[in-house]
């Protein structure tokens, strides 16, 4: 089944460029159409840097964040007026250490951050139970303390965008009936 879906997706894409910005604009356009898809995924690689994250030499983390910004802008262009109903959710597979290592980078860590954007987001804010950055407030005295289960954030986005009940999402999507609300 997966191979059939994959092949159909490839056939539907035609000859559009495969860079993240072009794919985001294409996906936004498809999602803006009546009966179009309700979600898409764009993967951005090269964030797992351990050196030169902010010193302007080599792999610069700022360039990668600009790419995220450009992909969100491409979604917005593609969505057109459907942008007003959109939610864009960024995810990462692992956190980073709080302190910089000896090569101007950070290493794999525990806690992380996410970014939610889109036209349906009406208020800028940070959603966190912020413990602080003092050593005794860090996980194992080196990482951000994870205080919110990111699945709860995903569930809230699904709830808002698809109008589904939180408890249904918790039990049927995340298989955790005790998943807290955010």
State where each predicted segment sits.
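Ligand-binding pockets and gating/stacking loops
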Residues: 1-182
